[in-house]
UniProtKB/Swiss-Prot annotation:
SMART domains from the UniProt entry: Inhibitor_I29, Pept_C1
Top-rank taxon: Eukaryota
Glycosylated residues, chain numbering: 228, 372
GO terms of molecular function: cysteine-type endopeptidase activity
Annotated GO CC locations: lysosome
Function, in words: The cysteine proteinases have a potential role in host-parasite interaction and virulence.
Keywords, ordered alphabetically: Disulfide bond, Glycoprotein, Hydrolase, Lysosome, Protease, Signal, Thiol protease, Virulence, Zymogen
Protein name as catalogued: Cysteine proteinase 2
Annotated propeptide span(s): 20-124
Subcellular location: Lysosome
Record EC number: 3.4.22.-
EC top class named in words: hydrolase
Catalytic-site annotation from UniProt: 150, 289, 309
Amino acid sequence: MATSRAALCAVAVVCVVLAAACAPARAIHVGTPAAALFEEFKRTYGRAYETLAEEQQRLANFERNLELMREHQARNPHAQFGITKFFDLSEAEFAARYLNGAAYFAAAKRHAAQHYRKARADLSAVPDAVDWREKGAVTPVKDQGACGSCWAFSAVGNIEGQWYLAGHELVSLSEQQLVSCDDMNDGCDGGLMLQAFDWLLQNTNGHLHTEDSYPYVSGNGYVPECSNSSEELVVGAQIDGHVLIGSSEKAMAAWLAKNGPIAIALDASSFMSYKSGVLTACIGKQLNHGVLLVGYDMTGEVPYWVIKNSWGGDWGEQGYVRVVMGVNACLLSEYPVSAHVRESAAPGTSTSSETPAPRPVMVEQVICFDKNCTQGCRKTLIKANECHKNGGGGASMIKCSPQKVTMCTYSNEFCVGGGLCFETPDGKCAPYFLGSIMNTCHYT
């Protein structure tokens, strides 16, 4: 899936320490040829390949993943690894289909630190263990499929929990609405949870449809056009804001214990062959995957977080993974975020006077005659995310997102349908027709 190193997945939490009893690396499938294991893998997961060349490549991928599995097992005595449904994929294929892309999260932290409200947490009394699944705030595990939409599943899972904890019924909400409609993110090519919250606030008054009325269909990597059929779509929840949570695990635990599941980003490179137990040596090189933090347990020998993934219930511990607390394992403490739901809100009933308007964003646009944004310049202030009629039957809109500004013109006065769009870096000079342009976003 598709920008900083900050935060881009059920069974009851129990204190299970698998200790050194887990099979050491050399003991995993010892004595069984890789070709025989591959044949068993194909039968188990119904794999059939079109050509001999593809079969040979898939076998090579499988053998490489066996090596990686044994390496992970050797470093993680409290976890168990094994052959999973991903084993015929190359590392590059796995990353492209199931991870978000480091570039997105690398820019996100810088942008978020500058522009988003930070939440405070009471660190004085953090419970020893919390599991929001036991309290009814978590929907069943879902499956993103071969689509880099983890960001949408992370954001939606967080909203589901926040909606429930604001006093409403737990309802499964639509990831497809974000994947197909959210033009601040990139569908199956990746995205960010904070941008998803922003898009909802700026384009739907914070409303998110139910999964039943707008089901997920992008598991094969195809993203259909956005559906706006008001007769078929049902609003399931509404958010009125979002927050950044302190990037320390103690602050995260305190906030989660009081407020519910947290959308986080992490490095999921160690997850391909994970089966069960607690990861204690998780790769932490770059953020590449969005997940949902639903609980933790500090009562046993190895304290751990409980994380809801979006790879289906046949992965990990019925769709979940446990990761050691206290050492920023998998970089999980670097991008913790949450939507906010007003307790009095009810789906489809709020008015503009009841829900605070999104924070205004102004764009300072400088258009110049030269190529360096220095000569013959004209400066204009434009309100972002608002349709501006141009007087000739058309209109334009300008939008801000991390590190870029998008300008679109439309042949209608409502800024709907396909527009002609042009992107520039935020706050940097760029070529523009025979001269240059610089768009700078100001968050008021």
